Amino acid sequence: MGDPKFHHKKYSTPRHPWEKERIDEENKIVVKYGLKNKKEIWRSEALLSSIRSQARDLRARLRTNDVNAQKQLERMIKRLNRYKLLSENATLDDVLSLTVENILDRRLQTIVFRKNLAISVRQARQLITHGHISVAGRRVTVPGMLVEAKDEDTIAYEENSPVANELHPIRQALLAPAQRSAEMKEGQGEASEEGETDE
């Protein structure tokens, strides 16, 4: 089992390291989620494997009318719901249908990018590791942290970070596309009004 004070691997490497289809699929995931390396995929796969293993065990125990199995299933679904991986009314089949991308979608790095706090998913990682992002008022520097649903709305720039200033170049770059689209809409509106007056 090993000494608990030492770090242990939280993932296992692929059994066949040179499978082209798997490598291509992993490369797409690395680009999509801005991952540092494939270990981050394997770590998510290990977590998913653990969840599925528990679900399969519970399914077998439910068939034998195990008294505690239903309670454990409810606790599992409640825990997964806390991370917005499943709904409150989810079933065992929903647990078994979870994918690696469902796990990666709950990473802090992914959510920072989707909340439009970074220009790219890679930049989201940089902002987190450099201490520019806070969750529930606390600075977080771990891009791979799984975010609970209750904390998602509290993700913001760290108050003492220079990026928190709206005049920071990153903030201006984030505002630029929105401003351009707003100006285009205004221009289209003015053009249509002019057309109506000409008639």
From Swiss-Prot:
<keyword id="KW-0687">Ribonucleoprotein</keyword>
<comment type="similarity">
    <text>Belongs to the universal ribosomal protein uS4 family.</text>
</comment>
<dbReference type="InterPro" id="IPR002942">
    <property type="entry name" value="S4_RNA-bd"/>
</dbReference>
<dbReference type="GO" id="GO:0042274">
    <property type="term" value="P:ribosomal small subunit biogenesis"/>
</dbReference>
<feature type="domain" description="S4 RNA-binding">
    <location>
        <begin position="106"/>
        <end position="170"/>
    </location>
</feature>
<dbReference type="InterPro" id="IPR005710">
    <property type="entry name" value="Ribosomal_uS4_euk/arc"/>
</dbReference>
<dbReference type="GO" id="GO:0015935">
    <property type="term" value="C:small ribosomal subunit"/>
</dbReference>
<keyword id="KW-0694">RNA-binding</keyword>
<keyword id="KW-0699">rRNA-binding</keyword>
<comment type="function">
    <text>With S5 and S12 plays an important role in translational accuracy.</text>
</comment>
<dbReference type="InterPro" id="IPR022801">
    <property type="entry name" value="Ribosomal_uS4"/>
</dbReference>
<comment type="function">
    <text>One of the primary rRNA binding proteins, it binds directly to 16S rRNA where it nucleates assembly of the body of the 30S subunit.</text>
</comment>
<dbReference type="GO" id="GO:0003735">
    <property type="term" value="F:structural constituent of ribosome"/>
</dbReference>
<dbReference type="InterPro" id="IPR018079">
    <property type="entry name" value="Ribosomal_uS4_CS"/>
</dbReference>
<dbReference type="Pfam" id="PF00163">
    <property type="entry name" value="Ribosomal_S4"/>
</dbReference>
<protein>
    <recommendedName>
        <fullName>Small ribosomal subunit protein uS4</fullName>
    </recommendedName>
</protein>
<dbReference type="GO" id="GO:0006412">
    <property type="term" value="P:translation"/>
</dbReference>
<dbReference type="Pfam" id="PF01479">
    <property type="entry name" value="S4"/>
</dbReference>
<dbReference type="InterPro" id="IPR001912">
    <property type="entry name" value="Ribosomal_uS4_N"/>
</dbReference>
<comment type="subunit">
    <text>Part of the 30S ribosomal subunit. Contacts protein S5. The interaction surface between S4 and S5 is involved in control of translational fidelity.</text>
</comment>
<dbReference type="GO" id="GO:0019843">
    <property type="term" value="F:rRNA binding"/>
</dbReference>
<feature type="region of interest" description="Disordered">
    <location>
        <begin position="177"/>
        <end position="199"/>
    </location>
</feature>
<dbReference type="InterPro" id="IPR022802">
    <property type="entry name" value="Ribosomal_uS4_arc"/>
</dbReference>
<keyword id="KW-0689">Ribosomal protein</keyword>
<dbReference type="InterPro" id="IPR036986">
    <property type="entry name" value="S4_RNA-bd_sf"/>
</dbReference>
